[in-house]
């Protein structure tokens, strides 16, 4: 690990000249309103009343043990305000000391108005997995852990997971290697297994576009990146068809792993925004970063044909992050990679 001086651009300094800051800049640390690194991995986004809420894993550089789930908010998906550690380490149980908490996902239940949080809980050896359930009356408040999510009265003992909320208000739990479960009307338990997608991997993420359901997933390479792939279906129940990669082969999903697909409003349309993690185990708090980019959709085909180091979230086009930027004082951060300028482009050797 290197301790590097990192020259921050004003574009990255949340809370400073925010009116000029509409760029998503991939693969480098983001900073919140307090000047701290945005620490929200394996994340999801919930939009409410014109504001976006980012939930993720509050990582540590010292241990993979669960330190809590974080929440940030923003009105533009670029400048983030720290809200709360919305679920803290529990005194005991599935998210007690020396346990793992990952893949946090939050949905608002349309029937009850309650915020439902699901997550993967485990022991440090990943041999005691559970899908956990927590609830809260307010979106960024203190969530209460209710225990394992139950299906037919039994805990769901699986690990990598995601969620999907359909336009009809039904909620779904997505599980590694293929199971898709429909949640009960109050989202507090599982009602039925509605599909099993053969050939799936880990980190499932689902979205719907033009009547087609898409399921993104990664291969199994632990913390290492790989070429993620996807499936499609005319309905959640299937039949599901494997379509292949959505990034160029060998690009390793631009050194990231799928975590979520957010429906980004663009005029009268909605653009699916890929959200991926660049893991940097064991230095996840200081060196792990994010890759967010719009997915191109044509029928049953999706793609991210090229990597955008930075892009304008309003115009959905790539931008040179050095163009017109103003440099500010240096800050010290931990990093496992170096940044350099080549032919007026900012590039990283991040793994």
Which residues are covered by each model-predicted region?
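Short beta-strands within extracellular/lumenal beta-sheet-rich domains
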Residues: 347-351
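Bacterial Sec-dependent N-terminal signal peptides
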Residues: 1-21
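Carbohydrate-active catalytic/glycan-binding domains of CAZyme proteins
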Residues: 19-345
């Amino acid at each position: 690990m290197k301790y590097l001086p990192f020259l921050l651009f004003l574009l990255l300094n949340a809370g400073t000249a925010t009116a000029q800051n509409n760029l998503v800049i991939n693969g480098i640390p983001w900073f919140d309103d307090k000047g701290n690194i945005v620490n929200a991995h394996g994340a999801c986004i919930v939009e409410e009343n014109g504001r976006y809420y980012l939930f993720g894993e509050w990582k540590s550089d010292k241990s993979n043990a669960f330190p809590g789930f974080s929440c940030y908010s923003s009105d533009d998906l670029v400048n983030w305000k720290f809200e709360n550690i919305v679920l803290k380490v529990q005194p005991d149980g599935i998210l007690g000391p020396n346990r793992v908490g990952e893949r946090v996902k939050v949905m608002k239940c349309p029937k009850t108005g309650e915020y439902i949080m699901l997550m993967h809980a485990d022991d440090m050896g990943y041999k005691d997995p559970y899908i956990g359930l927590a609830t809260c009356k307010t979106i960024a408040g203190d969530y209460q852990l209710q225990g394992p999510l139950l299906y037919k009265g039994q805990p769901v003992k699986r690990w990598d997971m995601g969620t999907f909320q359909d336009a009809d208000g039904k909620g779904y739990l997505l599980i590694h290697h293929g199971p898709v479960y429909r949640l009960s009307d109050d989202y507090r338990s599982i009602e039925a297994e509605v599909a099993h997608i053969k050939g799936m991997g880990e980190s499932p993420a689902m979205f719907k576009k033009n009547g087609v359901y898409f399921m993104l997933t990664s291969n199994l390479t632990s913390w290492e990146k790989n070429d993620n792939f996807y499936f499609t279906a005319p309905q959640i129940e299937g039949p599901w068809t494997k379509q292949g990669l959505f990034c160029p082969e060998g690009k390793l999903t631009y050194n990231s792993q799928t975590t979520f697909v957010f429906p980004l409003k663009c005029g009268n349309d909605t653009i699916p925004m890929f959200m991926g993690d660049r893991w940097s185990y064991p230095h996840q708090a200081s060196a792990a970063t994010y890759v967010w980019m719009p997915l191109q959709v044509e029928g049953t085909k999706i793609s991210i044909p090229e990597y955008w180091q930075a892009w304008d979230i309003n115009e959905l086009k790539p931008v040179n992050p050095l163009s017109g930027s103003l440099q500010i004082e240096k800050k010290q951060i931990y990093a496992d990679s170096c940044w350099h300028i080549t032919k007026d482009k900012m590039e990283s050797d991040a793994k």
